[in-house]
Regions:
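Charged, alpha-helix-forming regions
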Residues: 1-224
Length: 224
């Protein structure tokens, strides 16, 4: 397994007056799925209680196999989530830094996890994560830009046009030209329409307007 790229303290997003900077190993779309499934499980707990689950149950919920390699993959993902450092600046006035999205204990014999969620990070996802959203993401496998857009747009009503250059930068796309990226963007948005994640979109020369219902977050890059 190749190592995930390590990020220096870098501005990942600046939307609606909130700047998000990231330091550490780059999180990916699979990490987002693990995190949001844990957040979903937390909704079923009383406030303040830890989240518990078996590796087998988590992998099954994510639609993955349950063999040794998948268990190792989950360990890697949990370690990335536990090691991430995120700094949030609100309207240029207040900044808050947080080490890790979560803390966890794992029983190596039973492969059962006990997870303590970081309160400030959990608040960023306070709108929750529905089963419908999870099913939508399952349909977007092998479509990294569509997956990233699904996570990004879930936290934005996007009633105003978004600059295509901004989406290009925030998504981490490897498209070398704006023309190439606009083509990829159109295909990704068409995929979101097809699964019912957004109602519609309009792309003009340098911006795109999207009609949808907001939900989750934009902290994960697409890696494309």
């Amino acid at each position: 397994m190749s190592a995930s790229p390590t990020k220096k303290r870098t501005l990942l997003a600046s939307v609606d007056g909130i700047e998000v900077r990231f330091l550490g190993v780059q999180l990916n779309q699979s990490d987002l799925d693990v995190w949001m499934q844990i957040v979903h499980l937390s909704r079923q707990q009383l406030p303040g209680y830890n989240v518990t689950f078996s590796a087998h149950a988590m992998l099954t919920a994510l639609g993955k196999g349950t063999g040794k390699s998948q268990h190792e993959w989950l360990k890697e993902s949990m370690a990335r989530l536990g090691g991430a450092f995120v700094e949030m600046t609100f309207h240029g006035r207040d900044s808050f830094g947080e080490k890790g999205f979560l803390r966890y204990y794992r029983d190596e014999t039973t492969q059962r996890y006990v997870v303590e969620l970081t309160e400030s990070m959990l608040r960023l996802f306070e709108d929750g994560y529905t089963h419908i959203e999870f099913e939508q993401r399952q349909k977007l496998r092998k479509q990294p830009l569509a997956l990233w857009l699904h996570g990004f747009l879930s936290s934005h009503a996007a009633r105003y046009p978004l600059k295509i250059t901004t989406i290009h930068r925030l998504s981490g796309s490897g498209a070398q030209t704006l023309r190439d990226f606009k083509y990829r963007l159109r295909k990704a948005l068409e995929a979101l329409v097809a699964i019912g994640a957004i109602d519609s979109f309009v792309i003009d020369e340098d911006s795109v307007k999207i009609k949808m219902i907001p939900k989750t977050s934009q902290l994960w890059k697409s890696g494309i």
